[in-house]
Amino acid sequence: MLEKALWIRTPQDIGTVSPEFRKNISVLSKVKKATAFVSAMGAYELFVNGKKAGNAVLAPGFTSFANRVLYAEYDITHLVSENTTLSILCGDGWAHHHFGFSKRIFVPHISAIAAFLIEYENGEKEYICTNETWQVYTSEILFSALYHGETVDKTADVKFIGNAAVDDTPHPALQKQTAFVTEQEHIKPAKMIRTPKGELVLDFGQNIAGYVEVKVRGKKGDKIVLSHAEVLDKDGNFYTENMRSARNLCTYVLSGEDDVFKPTFSFQGFRYVRIDESPENITEANFTAIVIHTDMERIGSFCCGNADLNKLYSNIIWGQKGNFVDIPTDCPQRDERMGWTGDAQVFCRTAAMNFDVEEFFDKWLSDMALEQRDDGAIYRFVPFVGWWNGNISAGWSDAAIICPWEVYNAYGNKEFLRKHYPMMKKWVDYVHGAGEEEFLWLGGEHFGDWLALDAGEGKFLGATQKDFIASAYFYYAASILAKAQAALDIDNSETLELAKNIKASFRKAFMKDGMPVLYPKYDGFTEKREVKAITQTSLALILHFGLFEEHEKDALVKALCALLSESGGAMTTGFLGTPYILHALSDNGCVKEAYDLLLRKEAPSWLFSVAKGATTIWEHWDGIKEDGSFWSADMNSFNHYAYGCVFDWMFANIGGIKILDGGAGYEHISITPHTDARLGFAKCGIKTRHGELSVKWSIEKEYTRYELDIPAGTKAVFTLPSGKTEELSKGSYMFIE
C-alpha cells in the first residue's frame, strides 16, 4: 500500500517544534472500510478529524534504522466523515534524537509516509498518499525529546508553513509493525510532600516508565513545570544526579480553559515528580502517572508466605514493565535507555515466565540479525547507536543465541527458532574464529562479571578473569546451538564435537586439579583491579555450564560454599555470575544455601533493596548504602532489571517447575518443589500455550500439602521429597507427605 506514497518533510527548518502534516479529503459515498498505513522517521501519531487513530504511543518504535522502519495499519472507518482531515503529528522519537553515549542522530530531519485506502460500499476504491500536496503546520508541541521531556504551549499560534517537501534522502525498508507500546496503567499519587528544601513533590509510590497526565484549569499563560526523579536523597530531598544529562522536564502553558497535558513524544523513568511551577490551586488530584510499555500478556504469577519475597517479585515485574518499552533497555530514566544485550540475555528466561514476550523479542532479535556483521559478530546493544566502535563482549553478544533459545523453550514455537537460527549459527562460528586458540575465546574488551563486588571498592569489572568467562560462554553457546539444531532436525554432530573440544580446551587452560586457575594471556579493559582464579562467579559458571567432571563436583560446590562463608554469607557476583549462583548451589545439593542467599536482607542481597523501599530492581546491589548515601552519581539506576533474573530460580525451585530437554513450551516438564519453612507456603503459576499450569505447596504441622494443576498437552513428572515420583497429565492433583 505504501509503494505509491512519498516520504514528506517540512519545506523549511522549524526548529524543535513538532510538525503536523495535513490533508483534507472529501468522502464521496458510503464507506465500507477505511484503512491507514503510516510510518515516520521520528515518532508520530495519526489523527482523523481530530481524533487519534489507535492506541499506540511512540510509534513506529526503535529499529535498526539503517535497515528498516516499521509501519502500522489502522482501521479508521469509524473516524472518517464526508469532509475528513487527515493529520500526522510528528516528533523526534528515536530516529531524530541525540541518542546514546555517542549522541547519534540517525536521520537529518523528521519525515513521514502514509497511504489511505477507502473502500466504498459500491465496490469502488480510493487511494490517498502522502506527497507534496500535503500541508505542513506548526503545533502546540514546542519541544520534545525522549531524554529531556516535552514543552506544550496551549496558547501557541499554530501556523501554516507551506506544502510538504518530498524527502529524497535514502530511507530504509518498510516492514509491518505488530508489537506496540501502549498506555497500560494509571496511578494516582500516594501523597504530596514538602521536602526539607521546601520542594513540592508528588510521590506515586512506584517507580515506573511512562509520564504524568495533568488535568487543570488556570489563567491563560500560567505554567506547570514538572521534574522527574526515581528516589529522594538521604535527607529526603529531590534527587536527579543519577539522570546524568537527561533533563526529564515537562513544561505546559495553560490555555485558560480546561486543559489536559501529557507528553506525546517523550517518556520518563520516575517515582517522584517535583512541581517546579504551577497555578496556586494545584493539588495532587490534578495528576495521574501513566505506565507505558510494549503490550504483552501477563502470564506468570507467584506468591508465598514471605512478604519480602512477594515484594521482590513485584519489583521484578515492575522492572520488566519499565524496561520493555519497545526494546529491552538497561534503564528507562537516564541518558541511555539502550538495548543492552547482556541485560536482556540474563533476564530473558524470567521475562518469558512473567509475560508473553515472543513477539517483543522477535522484533528486537530481527534487528539484531540485521545488524549482525558479516563475520557473525554481534554488538553490545541493539539497535546499534555507535560508541566503542561496536566492540563485542562475551555474555552480552551471546544474547544472539541465548535469547532465541530461551524464547523458543518457553513457548515451543519452532518457526520462531527457525527464523533466528541463522543468526545463532553465525554467532557461534564467529566466536570459533575469534582468537588465536581455536577452542578458546581469548582477548577482546569484555565487560566480564560487570559490577561484581570482588575486585575492590568502586570497581566496575569483577575479579573473575574475562578470558575465563568468554571461553565458558563459548561452550555454553555451542551447547545451546546443538540443542537448537536437534529441535530443528538439523544434524548437530559437528556442533557437539565443537562443544566437546571447547570443554577440553577450557579445562586445560582454566582448570587444574578440578579447580579454576588463571590463564597467562589475560587481556581486556585496562582498569586496575585484582584478578582471581577462584571466585563465586568462576565456580558458578563451571557448575552451571557443566564444565566439570563428575568426580570434581563436590569439591567445586564446597569451594563455592566456602567463598560464601568467607564473605559473611553474601554474594559478590555481578551481571554474569548472579544468574547462575543459586542454580549452581541448588542443582548440586545445596538448596538451603541457595535459599539463604535469596532470603538474605543485608547488603549485598536481593532483599536489601526491598528493605530500603525499592519498588523495582536496582543496577547496584548497594545503589543506596546502609547510611542512605548513593553508590555513585553517574551510574546508579534504580530501575535496572538484570538482577531480577533470580525469578527463574524461584520458579524452577520454589515452584519446582522445569522444562525438560525436548519439552519446549511446557510440553514435558519436571515438578520438584523445594520447600522452606521461612516461606510457609508458595504458589507459582503460568499460562502456557497449553493452558494454566500451577504448583502450590503449604507446610502444615505434620505434613506438606502439594496442589498441582496440569493443562492438556503437558506431561509432568512430579517428585516428592521422599523421592517418590508420579507421572501426571491433564488434571488437578493433591499430594501429602
Each model region followed by its residue ranges:
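Alpha-helix capping and helix-loop boundary segments enriched in small/acidic/polar residues
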Residues: 12-16, 60-65, 75-77, 102-107, ...
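Alpha-helical support elements that line or immediately flank enzyme active sites
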Residues: 35-37, 211-230, 275, 343-371, ...
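Extracellular/oxidizing-compartment recognition motifs
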Residues: 1-334, 342, 359-362, 379-386, ...
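Conserved, charged catalytic cores of large soluble enzymes
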Residues: 56, 471-489
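Non-catalytic C-terminal accessory modules of carbohydrate-active enzymes
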Residues: 108-117, 127-156, 165, 173-186, ...
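Active-site acid/base region of carbohydrate-active enzymes
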Residues: 43, 133, 137-138, 282-315, ...
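C-terminal capping/lid segments that line or modulate ligand- or cofactor-binding pockets
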Residues: 86, 152-153, 335-336, 354, ...
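Active/binding-pocket-proximal capping segment
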Residues: 44, 53-56, 60, 368, ...
